């Protein structure tokens, strides 16, 4: 992850302008995006320990129908400078076409246009029967990068929504039973997706563990990240794998790059008695992390093969901000947050998350805006 390039600077500047937060803490939002000098001193009552602060939330997208199309199932969040809009992909919804939605202002999101339908090279639309689009990033040339849990796959789509290419995925990452070498659990494959600040490195994270990385005692906390570098020809090549360990019982819905070579990882879990839980962990020096591509079983690997992480925000401990809930939650502000984006960092950064309502009457499509001090 090299230093930022002009395309990213322009994107970050536009994203900063688009990230309008609640008036009560607008100065702190400016600080997070480099447009003001305020500090977080006045946000103690909004703490999400140890280093996060809840700024605002919005349910304005919840159960929205736009030009006859139901919005829901949003599982990713990225900024598209060419559209001057935030973008989010629908994971899957039966035979409905796979779509990317566009909206502005994360404090009070408003849809800006009809969604973009994602299509195969022959022009036929992907749908919920053959894609489960969980990750989304915008490449420097404006193409859309989308990860799907179905196979899994990582595909590149043009701005017309037509697939242009796909990235190579190691055989063992296929869902168990779909191929002879597959070790992934269905609906727990390539969920997180991000592009480095340089625009030349892609990272995708596994939501769950490969069966080959589970210990004899059943420890399934070891996850793999795939790292791709861009060749001089412009094509993307898989260059290495990174090992990451979650807290027991957690999955990884999202990963986002920030700074020179740092990552922010979202860990999450759900229980019927406590609802959703989410924590954000920072990983520094990802570029120097050991390559574990040839490690057969991460649970038997030396501790040094697994990246170190630091808890920066426990969202269960955020203030509720008066948020409503339709199901049992230890904190009603929480829902099924699966998409995440960062403006700024290291230091004080604006972090926003979006929840996947699964097109369910008991869940929200909610945007949560935070300030987080990132190492």
Please give the residue ranges for each predicted region.
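Secretory targeting and sorting signals
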Residues: 1-31
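Sequence/structural signature of beta-propeller domains
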Residues: 2-4, 30-375
């Amino acid at each position: 992850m090299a230093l930022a390039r002009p395309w990213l600077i322009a994107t970050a500047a536009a994203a900063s302008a688009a990230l309008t937060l609640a008036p009560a803490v607008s100065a702190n939002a400016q600080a997070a995006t480099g447009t003001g000098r305020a500090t977080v001193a006045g946000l103690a009552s909004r703490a999400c320990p140890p280093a996060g602060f809840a700024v605002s939330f919005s349910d304005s997208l919840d159960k929205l129908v736009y030009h006859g199309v139901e919005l829901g199932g949003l599982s990713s969040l990225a900024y598209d400078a060419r559209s001057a809009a935030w973008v989010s992909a629908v994971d899957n919804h039966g035979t409905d076409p796979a779509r990317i939605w566009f909206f502005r202002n994360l404090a009070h999101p408003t849809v800006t246009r009809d969604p973009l339908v994602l299509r195969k090279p022959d022009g036929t639309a992907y749908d919920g029967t053959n894609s489960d689009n969980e990750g989304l990033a915008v490449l420097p040339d404006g193409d859309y990068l989308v990860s799907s849990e179905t196979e899994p796959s990582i595909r590149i789509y043009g701005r017309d929504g037509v697939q242009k290419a796909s990235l190579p995925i190691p055989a063992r990452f296929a869902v168990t039973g779909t191929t002879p070498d597959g070790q992934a659990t269905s609906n727990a494959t390539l969920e997180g997706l991000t592009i480095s600040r340089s625009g030349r490195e892609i990272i995708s994270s596994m939501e769950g563990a490969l069966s080959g990385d589970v210990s004899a005692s059943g420890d399934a906390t070891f996850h793999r990240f795939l790292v791709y570098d861009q060749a001089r020809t412009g094509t993307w090549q898989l260059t290495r794998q990174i090992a990451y360990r979650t807290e027991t019982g957690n999955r990884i819905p999202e990963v986002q790059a920030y700074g020179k070579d740092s990552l922010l990882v979202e860990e999450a879990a759900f229980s019927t008695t406590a609802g959703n839980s989410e924590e954000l962990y920072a990983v520094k020096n990802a570029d120097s992390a050991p390559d574990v591509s040839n490690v057969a079983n991460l649970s038997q690997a030396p501790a040094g093969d697994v990246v170190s992480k630091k808890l920066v925000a426990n969202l269960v401990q955020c203030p509720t901000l008066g948020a409503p809930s339709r199901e049992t939650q230890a904190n009603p502000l929480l829902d099924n947050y699966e998409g995440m984006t960062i403006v700024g960092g290291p230091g004080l950064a604006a972090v926003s998350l979006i929840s996947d309502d699964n097109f369910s009457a008991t869940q929200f499509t909610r945007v949560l805006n935070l300030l987080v001090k990132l190492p």
